[in-house]
Amino acid sequence: MTTTEFPSAVAKARFVRVSPRKARRVIDLVRGRSVTDALDILRWAPQAASEPVAKVIASAAANAQNNNGLDPATLVVATVYADEGPTAKRIRPRAQGRAFRIRKRTSHITVVVESRPAKDQRSAKSSRTRRAEASKAAAKAPAKKAPAKKAPAKKAPAKTAAKKAPAKTSETSDAKGGSD
């Protein structure tokens, strides 16, 4: 697999007062998307970490435009990650003289944006769209009939307890006092 180097720009925000785990939750939403899409997603994301991440992405886009002269319409969030910064430790008093530790975590957020050229029509289609078109074409084509299954053999009638009426014999009628 060959890798192509695209012109890029970097922005970092250090000592951001948000947990790296919470920042990564937001970062995963925008990785690989265009800068405009990423900023739209972050604008409406309910997480508090979306604001500092959006600021860093906007800063990286501004760096690309002003320092490198790149077109903002072609910028894509190529790499974005949150590393752990220093943790400030505080104390929360508890009952009976105890004290629990509060960890105020910080993050270092790094964003790399690249200017990628517009894709041609063929590669612009997603693989999902191509699969859907292929399945539609297969559905329109006349389907080959599968060999017909043999009809199952008829089952023998189930045995039932048939109640037979007692046959009239001369003995039974004589015993009852009947006349012959």
Swiss-Prot record:
Q: Which PROSITE patterns match?
A: RIBOSOMAL_L22
Show the InterPro entries listed in the entry. Ribosomal_uL22, Ribosomal_uL22_bac/chlpt-type, Ribosomal_uL22_bac/org-type, Ribosomal_uL22_CS, Ribosomal_uL22_sf
**Domain of life of the organism encoding this protein:** Bacteria
**A cellular component annotation (GO) from this entry:** cytosolic large ribosomal subunit
What terms describe the molecular function in GO for this protein? rRNA binding; structural constituent of ribosome
Any idea which UniProt keywords this protein has? Answer: Ribonucleoprotein, Ribosomal protein, RNA-binding, rRNA-binding
Query: Is Ribosomal protein there in the keyword field?
Result: yes
Biased region (Basic residues) positions are 142-166
Positions of region (Disordered):
111-180
Instruction: Give GO BP annotations, semicolon-separated.
Output: translation
Basic and acidic residues bias: start-end ranges: 171-180
One Pfam family recorded for the sequence? Ribosomal_L22
Its biological purpose is as follows:
This protein binds specifically to 23S rRNA; its binding is stimulated by other ribosomal proteins, e.g. L4, L17, and L20. It is important during the early stages of 50S assembly. It makes multiple contacts with different domains of the 23S rRNA in the assembled 50S subunit and ribosome. The globular domain of the protein is located near the polypeptide exit tunnel on the outside of the subunit, while an extended beta-hairpin is found that lines the wall of the exit tunnel in the center of the 70S ribosome.
| PANTHER family tied to this protein | CHLOROPLAST 50S RIBOSOMAL PROTEIN L22-RELATED, LARGE RIBOSOMAL SUBUNIT PROTEIN UL22M
Q: What is the similarity comment for this entry?
A: Belongs to the universal ribosomal protein uL22 family.
User: What is the protein's quaternary organization?
Assistant: Part of the 50S ribosomal subunit.
Mind telling me what this protein is named?
A: Large ribosomal subunit protein uL22
Recorded source organism is: Mycolicibacterium paratuberculosis (strain ATCC BAA-968 / K-10)
